Structures are given as C-alpha cells and as structure tokens.
Amino acid sequence: MQAKKRYFILLSAGSCLALLFYFGGVQFRASRSHSRREEHSGRNGLHQPSPDHFWPRFPDALRPFFPWDQLENEDSSVHISPRQKRDANSSIYKGKKCRMESCFDFTLCKKNGFKVYVYPQQKGEKIAESYQNILAAIEGSRFYTSDPSQACLFVLSLDTLDRDQLSPQYVHNLRSKVQSLHLWNNGRNHLIFNLYSGTWPDYTEDVGFDIGQAMLAKASISTENFRPNFDVSIPLFSKDHPRTGGERGFLKFNTIPPLRKYMLVFKGKRYLTGIGSDTRNALYHVHNGEDVLLLTTCKHGKDWQKHKDSRCDRDNTEYEKYDYREMLHNATFCLVPRGRRLGSFRFLEALQAACVPVMLSNGWELPFSEVINWNQAAVIGDERLLLQIPSTIRSIHQDKILALRQQTQFLWEAYFSSVEKIVLTTLEIIQDRIFKHISRNSLIWNKHPGGLFVLPQYSSYLGDFPYYYANLGLKPPSKFTAVIHAVTPLVSQSQPVLKLLVAAAKSQYCAQIIVLWNCDKPLPAKHRWPATAVPVIVIEGESKVMSSRFLPYDNIITDAVLSLDEDTVLSTTEVDFAFTVWQSFPERIVGYPARSHFWDNSKERWGYTSKWTNDYSMVLTGAAIYHKYYHYLYSHYLPASLKNMVDQLANCEDILMNFLVSAVTKLPPIKVTQKKQYKETMMGQTSRASRWADPDHFAQRQSCMNTFASWFGYMPLIHSQMRLDPVLFKDQVSILRKKYRDIERL
C-alpha cells in the first residue's frame, strides 16, 4: 500500500515538471520569436503591435487622489526622474562616506576632554535669532571653551540654519567665507547646524557649500543622506522656540481610559502641486468629520487660486470651523505628515500636547534617533498605507496609548522643550561617540530623568545613580555618611556641633561622619572630638567656600548623604526616621527645615519665604538626606557663575541644590514630621553661623531665587503639601506600639 502511494506521488511530480517545462518552453520560444519580429520590423521600417495591445483596457476602478493630468500640465518640472533625484542627492555631500573613525580627529578630545569652541562673530554678518540662541546655549554650557587650542569640536559663527535661497535669512557667499577660516581644515571636527536646505521645487538637502568632513546637526534629514554615527538629526523648531527652560508638557494628569474626544486630528496646509502634495492631497479620504478630523486649506502662497481645484472651497470652509489648539488638546493621536521638507512643526507641537504623533513622512530620520526609541512615543506610519492609519490606531490597546502619551511628555521635557536642550542633547550624543567606554545606554536616554542629567563620567554602573533601583531590582542603600559643615572654632565641649556629632553617630544606619572644616581657625586636636562607634573624618576645606560642602569627596563611601549644619539640633530617632523615609524616595531630598517660593505680582519677581504655610517647595540642606550623586551634579553640571555667586554671598547654596534636584526629578522634596525649629538659638553672634540673623541674609536669598530661575529658564521648584510622620504618630495608643516614640516628645 505504501509503495503505491510513493509511485503515485512520483508520477504526479513528474507530470507537473513536464507541464512546467512545456509551457515555459512555449513562452520562451514565443518571446524569442517576438523579439526577432521586432528586430526585423525595425529594419524594414514597419510597426508591429505589442502583445499588450491584445489585452482589454479596463477603466480606472479607483478615483485618483488628485487629477494628475492637471498637475502635470500646471508644472511638469516638479516631477523629476528617480535617476535625476539620485544624482542630485549624491552631489549634496562629498563626504557622504564620512564616519567618526574616518573624518574625526579623536586626539583633540583626549588632551582636554570634550570642549567646544565657537568662532568669534565677524563684523557685518547677520545672525538670525534662532542661531544666536544655539550659539548662546553652547557658550553657556559646561563644554564651552574660548581657547581653540583646547577645543575638541568647532562651531561656526556664520549662520547656516536657513539655506533656502529664497529666504531673507539666507547668507550669501558662505562657501568662500567658510573656506577662509584658518581652523576650517576641510571641516574636520566641525559641527554645522541646519534647519532649512534646498528650495522650490525639489527642496534637496543641499546646504549650498561644501561641508567637507564636517558633521551635520540637521532637521528634515533623510535616511538616504544621513550618515549614521556621524550626523545628528534634530527637530524642526520655530524662531519662537524658547532659548532655555521652555514650557512643561500639557499632560497634567492621566485619564483612564486614555481616549479623548477625537481619535486622530491634523490641521495644516494642502499643497496643490509639488513635492509633499501627494499625501496631503489624500487626507480627505480618511477624514470623517467625527472623531477623525484631517483639515487642510488651499489658502497659502501667492498664487494658490491659480492652482485651486474643485475641492478647495469645501476644504477651506471646513478648515475654518475648528480651532487648532482645541483639537490638539482633545485628541488621542495627531497626524504628522511631511510638508515640503520631511520635518514639520507639528511634530514638537504634538509632543508637548501629549498627543501621540502618527508619523507619515517616509524616509525621515527621526530626531535623535541614535539614542531615542521612537516606538515608545509615536506611531510610525507609511505614506503608501494612508487609508490603513485609522484602523491601525484604533487597534492600539489603551494601556499602550497611556504609555505612549507619558513617554511624549518625558521626551518633550528632557530633550525638546528649549533650544538649549536640543543643542545639549546634540553635544552629548557626539560626546558619547567619542568616549564610548563611558557612553550612556538606551535605558538612560529613554527613562527618566534622561541623558542630560545622568553624567556617565560619574559612573558607568546604573546602580550608582538614584533613578534605576527599580529597573535593576536593587534596594536603596542601607547606610549613610553624615557630612557636618563646621564654620566656627571649637572652644567648648558643650557646643551644638559636638552634640550633633554624637546623635548622628548613634544612628544604626550611620557608616561614618565627615566634618568639613571651613573655619578660619586651625583644626582642633583629635582629642577634642568625642569618641564614637563610627569613624570621624575631619577634612579641611581648601578654598573654604560655601560650595565646598557639595564637592564629591572620595571620603564619602556611601550613596546616602546626611547633610548637616553645625548648629542643627536633631536627635538620633529623628535621624533614623528621616533615613528610612529617604530609602523609599532615594532620588529626592528628604529632611526637616522647609521653605517655600511664591510669585510677587507687585514686583514681578520670585519671592522666598520661611513662613509656615500649608505647602512648601524646598527642604534646606542644613538637615536633609539626599543621594551622593547630587554632589557630583552640583559640581560638574551647574555653571561656574552660579557657584561663584553662592561663594561670594556665602549664602543660597541650599536653595541652589533644591533648584537642581527639582529640575532633575520634576518632583518636590519631602518634609518629615511637624518639627519647625531645627537650629540652635544660643550660637554666638560673632559666629559665621549667625548669618541667619543678618538682615541682608534674607534679601540675598530673594535675589538668588530670581538669578537661579533666570539661568534654568523656568521655575523648577514644585509645591507640595505632603508631610510624612511615623505610623501611629500622636495616635491614642500605647507608646510601646510606636517605633519612633521619642519624636512625639520633641
């Protein structure tokens, strides 16, 4: 029986092969004879009908998106062949094969680290406001150097942002101006910023001069012309984009379910002719007037009526019915189709509004795609599959929509809300390429707080930062180092600093105590310090300035730091409770003395208050616990100008630390217990600690608030009404049931 089956299968296979060979041979002979007939007719001047002539011609089953014959008649020069397009693109960059290994000199960076030099501005050269903001962001960063011999990267002062020849911002004769720069060196180790390139009708990515071996930080760059790990794709931003700070995202709270009034929206220009018109002319097929609103208008450009079609009047009327901002804030998804160029202002607008972008721009290298995983924040569509977009986004689960929306807010606030953040992200990406052994990984770039606040020079291990304990499955540190800032001489054994030292040393969580001696008097003898169960290390400050208390000392062996002023009054129980609270919030400042900020309408400036109200926004570092990483961030991230101000005033260092931590975490600090008085009131009036009684001290702190807010570009401090007390605090139960029973008596 089995043999019969095998024979039958073999016979069937043989028959199929024979039929295939027969029909294939017939077609092959037919094609050869047809080619011979064509050759013969060509020699005799005769015309033979092609085989296609015998096939029936069916009418178009689908209506085209646009009357192509009309479009061709209006401007046939717009349509160029693929070969012409390839030739145009290939001539854009002569250094198209450039990579970091072949077109970048790493030796310049190994000498002095990653330093950026900006060419001095030339007389008579006009610079647009957007490019001035870019240069100001570089010059205000920690990477800037005014000495070209120390530079690793060079940035032109010549405005290269707008290279559209029809633009009033276009800089003429840029080729000769760049070549005349004595440090140009064929563009090696140079970075060129560009937002607009090419012009009507094809809008190629030609910047109008030979960039040589320079890197491009470019908007609307195509994947075809993008040089991986060499160029940087940046977003297209308007001239009104804030230089620093920027507005926060518009998502104030999460709605469950995360669906809004409209499923998908878009409102913009409809290009009747030319590049970018194909997709926008087809949007009306998807628009349903209910939860999918894709509105376009023909009213743009000087001669729009010349190209007006039969649908323009209806589109223009529908376009005027809806307010764009209202649509943006009430939509779940926002369509981001390409314009004349690949990039669009709609991209950043959607991110800020927490409207999940639906990208419809084939071939666009998305901004910072080298480090950002856009699949976590956007839907990547295909222009050729426009009609499938509604069904695709409707199939996305609500949990996924919520995650996408939250990620848009993180990315907006971390990398896109200001020109400064866009520039610094560009520089950090280049720095990671140069120093690959300490570069940031994808988790750092795509998780809070982002790559700008996580400095890999501090550590290459994520567990050394306070933000990734949950991701790594780690527990917060179990010990702390107490750092006591001493500014008065040790003259009595009853001084508050000695009582404080003993109280901190008795804590079960204390690993060691460091006394930072910032006093003008010599160090006291070792026998003057009380005996403790933990090591006591006395460090004499070299410069003896206020900022020295936040230096990243190697002697600090724990991740947790208990920062104390010498006149602070705390018990061991209070220290223990504050530390256990901090273990639940390791990225925040946790402590006792709370202060607040407010906006003074009469003076139009920020104010500082120590009054006890129902909320607070700062916890002073005279009695607070925080992560050691903030010492490194304070010393290496903040500009020298702010730290010099603190040192000159001998004031405001605690406010500056609160500004920094709130800017990183986007969260307020945490106050513990209801304790109000944390200072020793009997300190001598000749002591430097008596600065709190100085009438100028409070006025200085008011001034500091506004200076710090100006540098950050916004007010990072956040008000909170939360206070954490021990369980059963002041409850009418037995005192034996309470762990921190002593706190109620303090």
Curated annotation (Swiss-Prot):
Q: Give me the Lumenal side stretches, as residue ranges.
A: 29-746
The molecular function terms in GO held by this entry are: glucuronosyl-N-acetylglucosaminyl-proteoglycan 4-alpha-N-acetylglucosaminyltransferase activity; glycosyltransferase activity; metal ion binding; N-acetylglucosaminyl-proteoglycan 4-beta-glucuronosyltransferase activity; protein heterodimerization activity; protein homodimerization activity
- The UniProt transmembrane annotation reads 8-28
The way this protein sits in the membrane is described as:
Single-pass type II membrane protein
Broad enzyme group: transferase
* One GO-annotated biological process of the protein: sodium ion homeostasis
Q: In which pathway does it act?
A: Protein modification; protein glycosylation
Q: Where does a protein bind?
A: 166, 203, 300
Q: Where in the cell is it found?
A: Golgi apparatus membrane; Golgi apparatus, cis-Golgi network membrane; Endoplasmic reticulum membrane
Residues modified by carbohydrate are: 89, 330
Modification after translation: N-glycosylated.
Q: Which reaction does it catalyse?
A: 3-O-{alpha-D-GlcNAc-[(1->4)-beta-D-GlcA-(1->4)-alpha-D-GlcNAc](n)-(1->4)-beta-D-GlcA-(1->3)-beta-D-Gal-(1->3)-beta-D-Gal-(1->4)-beta-D-Xyl}-L-seryl-[protein] + UDP-alpha-D-glucuronate = 3-O-{[(1->4)-beta-D-GlcA-(1->4)-alpha-D-GlcNAc](n+1)-(1->4)-beta-D-GlcA-(1->3)-beta-D-Gal-(1->3)-beta-D-Gal-(1->4)-beta-D-Xyl}-L-seryl-[protein] + UDP + H(+)
Q: Name one Pfam family in it.
A: Exostosin_GT47
Summarize where UDP binds, as residue positions.
267, 269, 271, 280, 319, 324, 346, 349
Please classify the protein's predominant subcellular localization into one broad category: Golgi
- Family per record: Belongs to the glycosyltransferase 47 family.
Q: What does this protein do?
A: Glycosyltransferase forming with EXT2 the heterodimeric heparan sulfate polymerase which catalyzes the elongation of the heparan sulfate glycan backbone. Glycan backbone extension consists in the alternating transfer of (1->4)-beta-D-GlcA and (1->4)-alpha-D-GlcNAc residues from their respective UDP-sugar donors.
The name under which this protein is listed is Exostosin-1
What organism does this protein naturally occur in? Mus musculus
